[in-house]
Amino acid sequence: ISPNDSPCFENLQDEVDITKLPIPHHWPQDRGRYVSASVIIAEDDGVRNMSFHRQFVRDKNHLVVRLVPRHLRTMVMAARGQGRKVKIAIVNAPDPVVLLAAAMSFDDNVDELTIAAALHQKLYGTPLNLTTMPNGIVAPANSEYVMWGNITMEDDDEGPYVDITGTVDDVRQEPVIEIEGVAHRNNPIFHALIPGEAEHKTLMGLPRSPTIKSAVNEVVECLDVHLTEGGCGWLSAV
């Protein structure tokens, strides 16, 4: 739908300053304030990816993003090899089907936003409303907050950060995001998840249960899968 009709564009920051957003400092051991529940939508060379990645607030218009060795890191490294930045949108508090699709891991040629749209149609009987950011990235129009910009050629320190196991993750050199614009709904609600708590474990573990069940069924009949509390909802299953 048109940006003019999109709730996420009801308010636009005159001057980019992400430090004014209600982004929490979750644990005392963390490096600082972290975006923990936002979804990054990236497009480059005709390929789109939508996924979760924590983001450290470095300053008014820069984040440092932890990219684990999955599709988005592959995209960024390929673009860097050709001297390109990667255009992105960062969406906060979209419809839950977007969160679920972004938490899944597919083959690199599967578009998570298309999966989210299919889930929305299946559950609600209506299309998922999408709109276009000023940099050309398509994102859910009903998100509470949207930011747009680029994953740059620069790296900076990311971490320490308390991760899903409750232990402190290492400091690494990770890509820097430059934010070009910020918009939000009227009376917006900023979605954050507490690292290592129930929502974190649900979003990481829930999409894995069907893949584990399918894999086990190739060897022996599997009735159900439970990701255990002892495995932090991620590292072990029965």
PLM region descriptions:
Residues 1-161, 166-238:
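Extended, highly charged
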